[in-house]
Amino acid sequence: MSDRRFALIPCAGTGSRAGGSVPKQYQPVAGRPMIWYALAAFSACDAISATALVLAPDDMPLESRFGADIFAGLRFDTAFVGGDTRHASVLAGLHHLAQLGATDTDWVLVHDAARPGLTPAMIHNLVRAVESDNDDDPDAAIGGILAVPVPDTLKRADAGERIGTTVPRDGLWQAQTPQMFRVGVLRQALQDALAAGAVVTDEASAIERLGLHPRLVNGSLRNFKVTYPEDFALAEVLLGTGPARSADSGA
């Protein structure tokens, strides 16, 4: 049997920079809770065997928070095992995937709940690129992430918030999600980082600590992360054509 692919969405954070009285992933965007869009994108992909949504232990099911009708037809399993950090939530989510039958050689695609612009086409592009990364030995494929080349000129500030230097943007990419790795390799990478007290801001950072070099796969500016209050207006514009289009479109 070929290796399967699972999605994992850590959803236990508070999103304080985005403002609002509820976590940003629960705030409305174009008539739907933000988290709906990621769940819809993965649900529309036949390549994904199952999706695990990792919530905080004291959270409530999405169906109780918003009503069951909103999530009707979406394929996902909820795990109330989220930790204090993304690192901890992903690690707990990997253990939950094992309970769903995921093996160490299966793939996991970890996605930010606050990236509602994800489409099935982006997911398929990532899967195709990662699984064909080593045609001579498919089992040796390391993994990869969606990302976009940095288009702007970057400035490094000095202590006085003045320009200290200009950072060459050649070869710089802005990491996005999903980030796709073998379940066992990612679990080991996260456990090693935790044991070393290392700060890893995404899954690829943990993989890099093992001396591995994940593949960069072209993503989309549409797949940006909603971080600040003003980002909601942009998300509304991108997704305002309707929830069905946001789930099915590759734009």
From Swiss-Prot:
PROSITE patterns: ISPD. The record marks R17, K24 as: Transition state stabilizer. GO terms for biological process: isopentenyl diphosphate biosynthetic process, methylerythritol 4-phosphate pathway. Its EC number is 2.7.7.60. The record marks R169, K225 as: Positions MEP for the nucleophilic attack. GO terms for molecular function: 2-C-methyl-D-erythritol 4-phosphate cytidylyltransferase activity. Keywords: Isoprene biosynthesis, Nucleotidyltransferase, Transferase. It catalyses: 2-C-methyl-D-erythritol 4-phosphate + CTP + H(+) = 4-CDP-2-C-methyl-D-erythritol + diphosphate. Pathway: Isoprenoid biosynthesis; isopentenyl diphosphate biosynthesis via DXP pathway; isopentenyl diphosphate from 1-deoxy-D-xylulose 5-phosphate: step 2/6. Catalyzes the formation of 4-diphosphocytidyl-2-C-methyl-D-erythritol from CTP and 2-C-methyl-D-erythritol 4-phosphate (MEP). Belongs to the IspD/TarI cytidylyltransferase family. IspD subfamily. This is 2-C-methyl-D-erythritol 4-phosphate cytidylyltransferase. It comes from Cupriavidus pinatubonensis (strain JMP 134 / LMG 1197) (Cupriavidus necator (strain JMP 134)). The lineage of its organism: Bacteria, Pseudomonadati, Pseudomonadota, Betaproteobacteria, Burkholderiales.
